[in-house]
């Protein structure tokens, strides 16, 4: 089976993902997934969720590069990229991933700061007198 490429995004993080048949190795930014995450098990479960849903955790090799955002946003971008790559490999995978919401881009981003305000919504302190 050929290598499939997809991109995933979350906030300002972007993940470029290459998926191919293999033994279940996941390499992110040249490091093993566990090394890259530094032992964050909750985030690891988030990343491998598309593989668990499609039951491909031991039959797909994944190579990915991530940039922008923090660890959590990069992990969710990686999950989105893996989901999109799997969906383009097999239509049956798409039918499994779509109901779980794994193919949907989470469009929530930081609200911009407005002038006359301290933050996006925080106003300066009001003094009555």
From Swiss-Prot:
GO terms for biological process: translation. Residues 114-129 have a biased composition (Basic residues). Residues 107-129 are annotated as: Disordered. GO terms for molecular function: RNA binding; structural constituent of ribosome. InterPro entries: Ribosomal_Su5_D2-typ_SF, Ribosomal_uS9, Ribosomal_uS9_bac/plastid, Ribosomal_uS9_CS, Ribsml_uS5_D2-typ_fold_subgr. It holds the Pfam family Ribosomal_S9. It comes from the Bacteria. Transmembrane segments: none annotated. Keywords: Ribonucleoprotein, Ribosomal protein. GO terms for cellular component: cytosolic small ribosomal subunit. Belongs to the universal ribosomal protein uS9 family. PANTHER family: RIBOSOMAL PROTEIN S9 (PTHR21569), SMALL RIBOSOMAL SUBUNIT PROTEIN US9M (PTHR21569:SF1). This is Small ribosomal subunit protein uS9. It comes from Campylobacter lari (strain RM2100 / D67 / ATCC BAA-1060). The gene is rpsI.
């Amino acid at each position: 089976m050929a290598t499939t490429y997809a991109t995933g995004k979350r906030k300002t993080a972007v993940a470029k993902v290459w998926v191919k048949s293999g033994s279940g190795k996941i390499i992110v930014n040249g490091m093993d997934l566990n090394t890259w995450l530094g032992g964050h098990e909750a985030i690891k479960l988030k990343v491998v969720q598309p593989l668990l849903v499609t039951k491909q955790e031991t039959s797909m090799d994944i190579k990915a590069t991530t940039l922008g955002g923090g660890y959590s946003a990069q992990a969710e971008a990686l999950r989105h990229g893996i989901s999109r790559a799997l969906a383009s490999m097999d239509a049956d995978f798409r039918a499994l991933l779509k109901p779980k919401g794994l193919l949907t881009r989470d469009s929530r981003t930081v609200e911009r700061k407005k002038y006359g305000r301290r933050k996006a919504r925080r106003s300066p302190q009001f003094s009555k007198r």
